[in-house]
């Protein structure tokens, strides 16, 4: 969902901030972006936007940001269908190529994301290729985690397979705690430096903050 920014920092990072401006821009995108779908909702400030995945929608968001549009974005969801009276979700065929020392962590993560391992082939030179069938919702946010688990040495590719009945239960959620701003103001270099040992920061010195804003991810769960 794309929506009007209602945070305490609304209106500070863009010149196009109203629902009408967002709607006009999204409908203009439909003229050239054939894989995009935009639907109005009961709330005039919120729009349902569907595309071909995180990368597709991420490119649209970045283009709009550079053009001066400011908005809030909801958590991505997969598009489900009802087939013969059964609720179904999209599944993908996933192939990962990793070093053997990272194999365990990757397999654990994909297991928590409802992945079903179909094949595993070592290459005899310290790497292994593993194939999975996994719900598309299990791949949301996995790219960054995969890069961390493999220290940037892993390869992954996935392609749509089919719509099949929804697997029960949710996929793995974020397992780490977060760092939260306790007051309004600007981020200070000294304060961020003192907090670095506690986790990875999302903000830089000089950025405006508000009370309750998530500013980093904690190193512990």
Where are these regions (language model features)?
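Accessory interaction regions appended to the cores of large information-processing enzymes
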Residues: 1-221
């Amino acid at each position: 969902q794309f929506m009007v920014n209602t945070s305490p920092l609304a209106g500070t990072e863009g010149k196009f901030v109203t629902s009408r401006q967002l709607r006009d821009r999204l409908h203009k995108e439909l003229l050239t972006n054939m894989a995009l779908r935009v639907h109005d909702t009961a709330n005039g400030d919120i729009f349902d936007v569907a595309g071909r995945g995180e990368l597709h929608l991420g490119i649209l968001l970045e283009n709009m940001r550079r053009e001066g549009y400011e908005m809030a974005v909801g958590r991505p969801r997969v598009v489900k269908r009802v087939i013969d009276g059964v609720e179904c979700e999209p599944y993908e065929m996933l192939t990962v190529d990793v070093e053997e020392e990272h194999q365990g962590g990757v397999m654990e993560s994909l297991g928590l994301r409802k992945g079903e391992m179909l094949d595993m082939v070592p290459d005899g030179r310290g790497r292994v290729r593993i194939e999975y069938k996994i719900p598309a919702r299990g791949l949301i946010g996995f790219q960054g985690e995969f890069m961390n688990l493999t220290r940037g040495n892993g390869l992954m590719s996935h392609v749509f397979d089919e719509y099949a009945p929804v697997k029960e239960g949710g996929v793995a959620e974020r397992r780490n705690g977060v760092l939260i701003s306790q007051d309004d103001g600007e981020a200070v270099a000294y304060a961020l430096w003192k907090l670095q040992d506690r986790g990875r920061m999302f903000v830089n010195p000089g950025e405006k903050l508000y009370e309750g804003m998530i500013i980093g991810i904690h190193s512990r769960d």
